[in-house]
A protein has these predicted regions:
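Short, charged, surface-exposed secondary-structure boundary motifs
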Residues: 40, 56-60, 104-111, 159, ...
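ATP-dependent carboxylate activation and anion-phosphoryl transfer catalytic cores
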Residues: 68, 233-237, 241-335
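Phosphate-binding site of ATP-dependent enzymes
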Residues: 175-259, 273-275
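ATP-binding N-terminal substructure of ATP-dependent carboxylate-amine bond-forming enzymes
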Residues: 1-99
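Preference for protein termini
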Residues: 1-31, 69-72, 76, 128, ...
Length: 335
């Protein structure tokens, strides 16, 4: 099995789950754009590949997958999805990606929010702009400085490029007591840094409240297996604590989104408070159970070894309250 972006934060847990599947031995092939990927050490074979946005990425992945005789390809990074999806019919093995249209509408946050509003799903008010002048106009339209707003690139992954515009931010406190990379700043500071033109930006109402996600496996029209979970204890842009939830309303909302977008294989839908803020048509952090191995089940489905009905029959195994605590680890080797 080939796992892309094998330097991603969840890689070690994912690889362990794929190996510890209780059915068979699995040979793992990792790829990453970084030479310092942990996949180099945790996989049975490793290949340094171009970035997912590089035009040569699909051909390189096809070459690696063919040379290694893998049975399936599991992408971890949002940046790998579209390049693979556009060439999926060239691969002799299953590639666990959604159709190109579903990926594009999910990764373009403006299109995502437009869809949410059309479906009646709560999502932030927003403006799609480019350049400092556009950000300034949109921020004031959304209520700045009376209330904080936020922005991020239309095309991004996770918290990359996300900033909160807050006129009350204590810059002295940030300077003296916070780690570098604080996400809050004043509008005028952002305007000094932003060029005119440049990438499209999404200026948004700031969603507040607890974070939750719905994760699972979809069949292009509905969720066949999945569950909601909390997303807590942020550190360096990553959540470090997750608790499985029993929330039928969140599952209903996720089913509506999955069906409208036509998502296939793995998905992750993220909420802050009541607002949907992100749709990721890929695998994300998993709360693992010894009797419910979502990544392995998703791969089995792609290989035709388990049916959607058989996956639906596993839904009662989801254990609300099951908790995952993420932590930092390290390994040593002689260079």
């Amino acid at each position: 099995m080939l796992v892309t972006a094998s330097g991603a934060p969840g890689t070690a847990a994912l690889l362990h789950a794929l190996r510890d599947n209780g059915e068979r031995e699995v040979r793992l092939v990792g790829t990453d754009m970084s030479e310092r990927s942990v996949g180099r050490h945790l996989c049975d074979a490793y290949h340094h590949v171009p970035a997912g946005s590089d035009p040569s990425f699909p051909d390189t992945m096809l070459e690696v997958a063919t040379r290694e005789s893998v049975d399936a390809i599991l992408p971890q990074s949002s940046f790998d999805l579209e390049g693979l999806a556009g060439h999926v019919d060239r691969f002799p093995m299953p590639v666990l990606v959604s159709p190109v249209d579903a990926i594009q509408r999910s990764n373009d946050k403006a299109l995502t929010y437009e869809l949410m509003h059309r479906l009646g799903v709560p999502a932030p008010a927003f403006f799609r702009v480019d350049g400092a002048a556009g950000v300034e106009r949109a921020a004031h339209e959304l209520g700045y400085p009376d209330r904080p707003v936020c922005f991020k690139p239309v095309f991004s992954s996770g918290s990359r490029g996300f900033r909160i515009l807050d006129p009350t931010v204590d810059r002295a406190h940030q300077l003296l007591y916070e780690r570098p990379g604080a996400v809050a700043m004043r509008l005028e500071e952002a305007l000094e840094l932003l060029p005119e033109g440049g990438v499209d930006l999404l200026v948004m109402e700031l969603a507040t409240g607890g974070e939750r996600t719905i994760d699972g496996i979809a069949n292009g029209g509905e969720i066949v297996l999945g569950h909601p979970k909390t997303r807590e204890a942020m550190r360096a842009g990553l959540a470090m604590y997750f608790v499985t939830l029993d929330d039928p309303e969140l599952m209903r909302l996720a089913s509506l989104i999955v069906g409208e977008l036509g998502i296939e294989h793995f998905f992750n839908i993220q909420l802050v408070g009541d607002y949907v803020i992100e749709i990721n048509p890929r695998i994300s952090t998993v709360v693992y159970q010894e009797d419910l191995n979502l990544p392995y089940l998703g791969v089995k489905r792609a290989l035709g070894e388990i049916s959607d009905d058989e996956l639906r029959a596993l839904r009662p195994r989801v254990r609300p309250g099951r908790t995952a605590l993420r932590y930092f680890d390290q390994l040593e080797f002689d260079a």
